[in-house]
Amino acid sequence: MTLFDRSWYNRGVVEKVFDFCTDAQRHKFFDQVGPFENMLEQEGVHLIKFWLNVGRAEHLSRFMERERNPLKYWKLSWIDVEDLNRWDAYSEAIDETLSKTNLDHSPWHVVRADDKRRARLAVMQTILSQFDYAGRN
């Protein structure tokens, strides 16, 4: 099992919000997602996509904790701080990215992630529901 955190979907969200890519590059990305994901699945990859959705207040709370905690400070970057100032642009980019890359053969599973424990359980439950295994029922 391989987990990708953020991965190439950044092209649709972060790169759009911060002008790290052109509109043409972003639209090309959207055009390539379906064929690429389809190719992966034809090669035996079982692709399960999750969007862990964190609300604005929780987002701020986590950033403040990272700022105060020397063991978590390394997780905080200038882009993270700027995120809150661009919340509306992020929301639009996320909605568009999820809409354009939510495909029949590889749908998104949007998980409310303000509560980390519940979010992790929801992700595990979804992953396990995708496979047959001894003792499943």
Positions of the model-derived regions?
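NTP-dependent small-molecule kinase module
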Residues: 90-137
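Arginine/glycine-rich "motif VI" loop of SF2 helicases in the C-terminal RecA-like domain
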Residues: 39-43, 100-103
